[in-house]
Amino acid sequence: MNPAQIVLFGSTFCVMIAVHFSMKLISEHVLNWKKPKEQKAIIIIIMMAPLYAVDSYVGLINFFGSETFFTFLDSIKECYEALVIAKFLALMYSYLNISLSKNIVPDEIKGREIHHSFPMTLFQPHTTRLDHHTLKLLKYWTWQFVVLRPMCSILMITLQYLEVYPSWINWTITIILNVSVSLALYSLVVFYHVFAKELEPHKPLSKFLCIKGIVFFCFWQGIVLDLMATMGIIRSRHSWLSVERIEEGYQNILVCVEMVFFSIYQTYAYSAAPYSANNKSNVLSDKKSK
């Protein structure tokens, strides 16, 4: 087997493992379908790892596709990332029994302090109190990425198809999206800190780290690969093979491998055990609520 065949075989194996663990976890939720509102959001989140793996694998198979094709593949991952962030917030709201539309703050937590960190303190007071307005603001900070990401993807694909896509537009859109996703993730962190006590039984930190880990690795390894290509560490030895294609290939291989670990981690973070009919803690909590 030549190196290309070994890479393709290894990537195929990784994708199969990622899909296996994810589908197994989804089937466990379906078989223990107790709280549809929560579990629908969880299933959408679980699908993130296999979708990233399959998307990257398609990029490896069609290694010599057009630039527009690869932009389309990246857009699928990133638009789904926006959906996952929105669903994660919806899941947290569901755990707290807070309406996304009404933004009603329960009396027992109204007035809690929210401590902002730099650079958010340039636009917000260092310390604010939780009320209807701040809860709505956190929701808007999350949803702006959900709206902006698909819009930017459509713009990028259209400009590339029309062959009007200078590098400065690419960098401008990249910066805008990075600021946007950072704000969305920041709002989720603030939301977690405000409701940490109430969310503790649901292991929100492990759930959030699962999402942030996928976003973090995919973004920063892309930056590192860009720097390595700029510094000449990644280079092409063939006239028919561009550095960009090699860089894209490395990124896709890494994503296929990483999604194996995230799909395994998801079995802990988004376990179906709390919804199992045999789960005693679930039964006790139901009795208390009654």
Annotate each language-model stretch with its function.
Residues 1-16, 20-82, 86:
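Membrane-proximal first intracellular loop
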Residues 4-21, 167-171, 198-199, 241-248, ...:
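Hydrophobic alpha-helical segments at protein termini of multi-pass membrane proteins
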Residues 10-17, 57, 72-79, 131, ...:
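Hydrophobic alpha-helical transmembrane segments of multi-pass membrane proteins
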Residues 14-17, 21-24, 48-55, 77-90, ...:
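Membrane-embedded alpha-helical transmembrane segments of multi-pass integral membrane proteins
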Residues 22-36, 60-68, 86-112, 226-233, ...:
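Juxtamembrane interfacial secondary-structure elements that flank transmembrane helices
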Residues 36, 111-237:
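Multipass alpha-helical transmembrane domains of eukaryotic endomembrane proteins
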Residues 102-127, 275-290:
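Non-transmembrane, juxtamembrane loop and terminal tail segments
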Residues 193, 197-290:
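C-terminal transmembrane module of eukaryotic multi-pass membrane proteins
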